[in-house]
């Protein structure tokens, strides 16, 4: 197993142990019944956030993406980007980070942007990509500041076609972002990594979900990027 594969599998195990990745029967916003659910909101204490940031930082450095700073879209991305900046500094790569407010301030420092000045090549840090709205808004803010969106860094790529339970699109939200903005989307792990985890988990309680996850992948999944 390569170092990258080990990192991906370590993240899946970590997410399961933290209760962030759970198995069962869940209805997604698209109306599809999924055998797994990923809830990044459960990374809710200092120790968990610190570990997540390490996964983000190592994945970004391993990706080969050239970057100068990080951007965290409000609201989840704010914490994720700032924690990742701390982790990067600990690994010897000190970069600035910025984030946006949902509503611009008209007092104090004012404006909708907080943190380091947006400049150079900027990596957008978020949890997942669903409809791509957060990415679009981030790209617009970064370009308006005269900087260049370099990549999007996310926790989990569901590798799932857009649409709903009946109308199934040709591409995933991640593929749409890559095609529209011409920049890579780097994920710590994806659905194939989840299937690999279930293959090797050795837990009878999880064995039944391997077949369900594979069937879900066959019905709604896209090819690996």
From Swiss-Prot:
Enzymatic class: transferase
A GO cellular component annotation in the UniProt record: cytoplasm
Disulfide-bond pairs as recorded: none
EC number in record: 2.4.2.10
Keywords: Glycosyltransferase, Magnesium, Pyrimidine biosynthesis, Transferase
UniProt-annotated binding residues for 5-phospho-alpha-D-ribose 1-diphosphate: 29, 75-76, 101-102, 105, 107, 126-134
Alphabetized NCBIfam families for the sequence: pyrE
Protein known as: Orotate phosphoribosyltransferase
Source lineage: Bacteria, Pseudomonadati, Pseudomonadota, Betaproteobacteria, Burkholderiales
